[in-house]
Curated annotation (Swiss-Prot):
GO CC annotations on file: extracellular region
Official protein name in the record: Repetitive proline-rich cell wall protein 2
Organism: Medicago truncatula
Signal peptide: 1-22
Cited function: This is a developmentally regulated putative cell wall protein.
Family: Belongs to the plant proline-rich protein superfamily. ENOD12 family.
Length: 371
C-alpha cells in the first residue's frame, strides 16, 4: 500500500509542479468560455415506417355441428337383369385390317375476299439517276433526216400534247406556235451533231404524272431516211446557252399516315404562374372547355391499418332438429315379371381370314404335345 501511494504522489507531482510554477509577471489571460449556441439540426425526416400488418392467424372457428340428416333409405327394387347370354364359342381375336380411309374430300371453303383497304403509299421519290451522257460518235450515226413536209421537227399538236406547263411566275412556258414557226432547215452538209454537255444542262426531271405519255402514231412515222451521200454536217459552234433554269419540281407532299401516338402522359408539373406583362402581350385566354382538367394523381394515402376486431366466435348451439320421421310407406313392391328376352342369335360376322405373311408375324408354334 505504501509503495502504491508513493507512486501516485510522484505522478501527481510531475503533472502539478510545472503548472504550479507559473509565470507571475504575466498572469494567465482569463478566457471566458465561448458560448456556442447549440446547433439546431433540422429534424431528420423519417418516413413513417409502414409496419406490415401483423399476421394474425385466422381464428379457427369451431366447426358448426350439423347433425347428420338421417335420410330414409331409398327403396330401390332389385333390378332383375336377365342372364347375359355368353356364347360358349371362343371367338379368336378378330383381326381388323387397317381400314384405309380414302382422303375425305373437303371442298375448298370459298372464303369471301378479305377487303384490304388500299394502302396509300406515298409516291416514292426516286432521285434522277445521273447517267453519264452516252456519247455517240457523229460518224457512225449520221443525223436522222426528218423531212420537213411529212413530219415537222418537234411538232407538238395543241390537242394531243399540251405544252409543258412551267410556272408562269418563275418562267413562262416557251410557247412554240406550230403554224408560225417554220421548220428550221438545217442543211445536212454543215450540221454537226449538237453536243449538249451534261454538266451545263441537268437532267430534266419530268414527273410521270404531269407529263402525259407521248403518243407517237406508228403510221405517221416515216422510215428513217439515210442519204447515201455522206455529207459533212454543218459545223455550228456550240452556243453557250445559259443553264436553263427549271424551277424546282414541286414534289407532292409525301403522305405520311398519321402515326397514332399514344397520348404522352405529362405529370402535372406545378409551374409557377407565368407572368406576362399586360402591355407587351395580354395573357392568352384559354377557354376552360379546351383546356383539359389538370390531372392530379390521387395522393396515395397509406392504408389505415385497422386491426381486425377480434369478434368472439358467436357460438350458436346446434339446433337439434329431430329427424323428421316419415313412416315408411309400405308400397307393395311393383312386381315386374322377368322380361324374357330370347337370346338374339346374331349370325357370326364372317370376316375373311386375313393372310398374315410369315415375315411380318410368324405363327407362334407351341411345344409338341407327346401323348
Amino acid at each position: 500500500m505504501a509503495s502504491s501511494n508513493l507512486l501516485v504522489l510522484l505522478l501527481f507531482a510531475l503533472f502539478a509542479i510545472p503548472r504550479g510554477l507559473a509565470n507571475y509577471d504575466k498572469p494567465p489571460v482569463y478566457q471566458p468560455p465561448v458560448y456556442k449556441p447549440p446547433v439546431e439540426k433540422p429534424p431528420v425526416y423519417k418516413p413513417p415506417v409502414e409496419k406490415p400488418p401483423v399476421y394474425k392467424p385466422p381464428v379457427e372457428k369451431p366447426p358448426v355441428y350439423k347433425p347428420p340428416v338421417e335420410k330414409p333409405p331409398v327403396y330401390k327394387p332389385p333390378v332383375e337383369k336377365p342372364p347375359v347370354y355368353k356364347p360358349p364359342v371362343e371367338k379368336p381375336p378378330v383381326y381388323k385390317p387397317p381400314v384405309e380411309k380414302p382422303p375425305v374430300y373437303k371442298p375448298p371453303v370459298e372464303k369471301p375476299p378479305v377487303y384490304k383497304p388500299p394502302v396509300e403509299k406515298p409516291p416514292v421519290y426516286k432521285p434522277p439517276v445521273e447517267k453519264p451522257p452516252v456519247y455517240k460518235p457523229p460518224v457512225e450515226k449520221p443525223p436522222v433526216y426528218k423531212p420537213p413536209v411529212e413530219k415537222p421537227p418537234v411538232y407538238k399538236p395543241p390537242v394531243e400534247k399540251p405544252p409543258v406547263y412551267k410556272p408562269p411566275v418563275e418562267k413562262p412556258p416557251v410557247y412554240k406556235p406550230p403554224v408560225e414557226k417554220p421548220p428550221v432547215y438545217k442543211p445536212p452538209v454543215e450540221k454537226p451533231p449538237v453536243y449538249k454537255p451534261p454538266v451545263e444542262k441537268p437532267p430534266v426531271y419530268k414527273p410521270p404524272v404531269e407529263k402525259p405519255p407521248v403518243y407517237k402514231p406508228p403510221v405517221e412515222k416515216p422510215p428513217v431516211y439515210k442519204p447515201p451521200v455522206e455529207k459533212p454536217p454543218i459545223y455550228k459552234p456550240p452556243v453557250e446557252k445559259p443553264p436553263v433554269y427549271k424551277p424546282p419540281v414541286e414534289k407532292p407532299p409525301v403522305y405520311k399516315p398519321p402515326v397514332e401516338k399514344p397520348p404522352i402522359y405529362k405529370p402535372p408539373v406545378e409551374k409557377p404562374p407565368v407572368y406576362k406583362p399586360p402591355v407587351e402581350k395580354p395573357p392568352v385566354y384559354k377557354p376552360p372547355v379546351e383546356k383539359p382538367p389538370v390531372y392530379k394523381p390521387p395522393v396515395e394515402k397509406p392504408p389505415v391499418y385497422k386491426p381486425p376486431v377480434e369478434k368472439p366466435p358467436v357460438y350458436k348451439p346446434p339446433v337439434y332438429k329431430p329427424p323428421v320421421y316419415k313412416p315408411p310407406v309400405e308400397k307393395p313392391p311393383v312386381y315386374k315379371p322377368p322380361v324374357y328376352k330370347p337370346p338374339v342369335e346374331k349370325p357370326p360376322v364372317y370376316k375373311p381370314p386375313v393372310y398374315k405373311p410369315p415375315v411380318e408375324k410368324p405363327p407362334v408354334y407351341g411345344p409338341p404335345h407327346h401323348p
